[in-house]
Amino acid sequence: MEYPKIYLALDNCFALKRWVEPETWLPLIKDLGYTSIQASYDNEFDMLYNTKEYIDSWFERLTAAEKQYGAKVQSFYSGYQTYRTSGLAHPDRRVVNSIVEGWIKPAVKIAGERNADMGFALHGIPENIMQNPEKYRECHEKL
């Protein structure tokens, strides 16, 4: 039997307000004894709110800090996306398309380019749809 590779990682969200740049929070996490880190799309480089130039620059800085300190962001996730929209289950297709094109595809691309894992819960089903079996079935099929 081949076992999966498992990392004990520290989420960098605790550093959000005081250690903002990768070169400040990454050595702090390394000093705590972690070499694997989980970073949040939301706190670092939300694709819906930041420019491509900023995101590219952020990753250049992250890569330099990883090399300098011997730690690596192994996974990215989103929690904030979960709370601000019903996401892929939104009844308006325009919202769904915007999330897919503006957030999900760029997030997958970024994680893939870095050979990193990613996770998120990007859908919520509105109550009025949950109470209507036909609408719920349609929504479930879309997901």
Question: Where do the language-model regions lie?
Answer:
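Short, conserved active-site loops that position catalytic residues or coordinate cofactors/metal ions
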Residues: L32-F45, S75-R84, H123
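Glycine-rich, proline-tolerant flexible connector loops at the mouths of alpha/beta enzymes
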Residues: Q38-E66, L122-E127
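Hydrophobic faces of well-ordered beta-strands that scaffold small-molecule active sites
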Residues: I6-N12, I37-A39, V73-S78, M118-F120
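Alpha-helix-loop-beta-strand connector modules within alpha/beta enzyme cores
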Residues: D56-S78, E141-L143
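Structural motif corresponding to alpha-helix initiation and N-cap regions
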Residues: W19-E23, K52-E60, I104
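Catalytic domains of carbohydrate-active enzymes, especially glycoside hydrolases
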Residues: P22-N43, P106-A107, R114, M118
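Active-site acidic/histidine proton-transfer and metal-coordination neighborhood
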Residues: K67-Y69, Y83-L143
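Boundary/entry segment of secreted carbohydrate-active catalytic domains
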Residues: M1-V20
